[in-house]
């Protein structure tokens, strides 16, 4: 699948890994619809091939409207799920037991939201004419927490583990439609989630990465997205993008 002239949808595309992906896609010649809760000012500065659609990824109608906007630009070929959130709550703590509503919120956004965008995006892609061997590709974002969850990450790890777990069966589901599904599991990246940390703390985190011993650059995530789009044999796979880190319990 060639990225040039393709129509892509990126959730969470106004910041962090999603914004880096959006910029990479635009640089490669794609048209991009950024789906996010806020960030129209950011997207407005990216040029006329970038559009903004405000939507909660768990909202079926809002996501459908965003995909309708993408369809108006041409056949949708690429969907990248970067929207997500997290919390740090122990099952039992001084504050009491983990609130069920807090657990559900994380799973709803990270797992159910990803699936919602995936299924509606797949429906659009399946209606397009094949280009060579395929119609399109869907790329999801998990986390190394799916494999090495730390203390306080029960909800986050469960949500990202769900994204990992559904990758292969959905790739098999969509194979007959000529749609690929791949998941990226990033490690420690320099994103807005870490923006509040002092420089010394971020440097300390980076030193935990075996090689290269630093935080990942969001552009490196975007580079992998482009490679996945253009490599037709990448399908049903979860790729750890983490510098060989394996997270300690805390």
Curated annotation (Swiss-Prot):
GO terms for cellular component: peptidoglycan-based cell wall; plasma membrane. Keywords: Oxidoreductase. Substrate binds at residue 143. NAD(+) binds at residues 15, 17, 36, 56-57, 82, 156, 160, 189, 191. PROSITE patterns: ADH_SHORT (PS00061). Its EC number is 1.-.-.-. GO terms for molecular function: oxidoreductase activity. The active site is at residue 156. Pfam families: adh_short. It is an enzyme of class 1 (oxidoreductase). This is Uncharacterized oxidoreductase Rv1144. The lineage of its organism: Bacteria, Bacillati, Actinomycetota, Actinomycetes, Mycobacteriales. Belongs to the short-chain dehydrogenases/reductases (SDR) family. The keyword Oxidoreductase applies.
């Amino acid at each position: 699948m060639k990225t040039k002239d393709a129509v892509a949808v990126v959730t969470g595309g106004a910041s962090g890994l999603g914004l880096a992906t959006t910029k990479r896609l635009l640089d490669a010649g794609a048209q991009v619809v950024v789906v996010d809760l806020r960030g129209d000012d950011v997207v407005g500065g990216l040029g006329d091939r970038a559009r903004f659609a405000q939507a909660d990824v768990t909202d079926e109608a809002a996501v459908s409207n965003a995909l309708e906007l993408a369809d108006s630009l041409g056949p949708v070929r690429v969907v990248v799920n970067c929207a997500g959130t997290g919390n740090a709550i122990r099952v039992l703590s001084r504050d009491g037991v983990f609130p069920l509503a807090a657990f559900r919120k994380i799973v709803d956004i990270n797992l159910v939201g990803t699936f919602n965008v995936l299924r509606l995006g797949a429906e659009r892609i399946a209606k397009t004419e094949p280009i060579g061997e395929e119609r399109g590709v869907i790329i999801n974002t998990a986390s190394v927490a799916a494999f090495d969850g730390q203390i306080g990450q029960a909800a986050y790890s469960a949500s990202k583990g769900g994204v990992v777990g559904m990758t292969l069966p959905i790739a098999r589901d969509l194979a007959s439609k000529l749609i690929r599904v791949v998941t990226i599991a990033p490690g420690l990246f320099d994103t807005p989630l870490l923006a509040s940390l002092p420089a010394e703390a971020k440097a300390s985190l980076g030193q935990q990465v075996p090689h290269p011993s630093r935080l990942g650059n969001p552009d490196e995530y975007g580079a992998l997205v482009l490679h996945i789009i253009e490599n037709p044999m990448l399908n049903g796979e979860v790729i750890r993008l983490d510098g060989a880190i394996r997270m300690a319990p805390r």
